[in-house]
Amino acid sequence: MQQDYSIPTGKELRIAISGASGCGNTTVSSILAKQLGIPCINYTFRNLAQELGLPLEEVIAQAKTDFRFDRLVDERQIERASQSSCVLGSRLAIWMLKQADLKVYLYASAEVRVARIFQREGGTLDGIRNFTAMRDRDDTRRYKELYNIDNTDYAFADMHIDTEHYKPDLIVELIIDELLRRSLILPREAE
């Protein structure tokens, strides 16, 4: 597939995209990385659970008291993101990837997030609503205890995008427009 954009010669580009579960983080990060022709790094508790052969719920439950899981996920993400140009999509990307050229925070209401997770994973709406609320609380507490990060304070991000009102492709267009505005990427014909 021919890429429409390029990174200026001799430069690298690192984009950090964060948001709570159901905000479109993984989808937007994947589409953006594909359009830019750079790797997408989205290593999560879900990946770690698969790697360890454990159910996701068990990893999440153990992570409440054992910070080893967070550290493993975060170390692997930062290690991979430090190697080359990439899009890093994770809950803490905008806080952890200090060298990111662009930091984007995606958000949506709890009800929209729950509906998206329900559509993606199935289950019951009440079960997902309760699990998502618990996970949000636990994530906020753990990040504060582990890294002294308040994941409810994302004012420093370069872009804040309400994903309730935009489809993933349009969100990617908004991010690409900002990358072009900052001269972090160039239209292919400008090479």
Model-predicted regions and their roles:
Residues P39-L97, E111, G122-N130, R137:
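ATP-dependent small-molecule kinase phosphotransfer cores
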Residues Q2, Q77, S82, A100, ...:
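Active-site cofactor/cluster-binding pocket
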Residues Q35, A100-Y105, E111:
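Internal catalytic or translocation cores that form aromatic/hydrophobic pockets or channels
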Residues M1-V59, R68, S82-Q83, Q99, ...:
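Glycine-rich phosphate-binding loop of ATP-dependent small-molecule kinases
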Residues R113-F118:
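Acidic donor-binding loop at a coil-to-helix junction in glycosyltransferase catalytic cores
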Residues I94-A100, T152-A155:
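Short loop/helix-cap segments at secondary-structure boundaries that form the rim of catalytic
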Residues L125-L174:
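Small-molecule kinase domains that catalyze NTP-dependent phosphoryl transfer to phosphate-bearing small molecules
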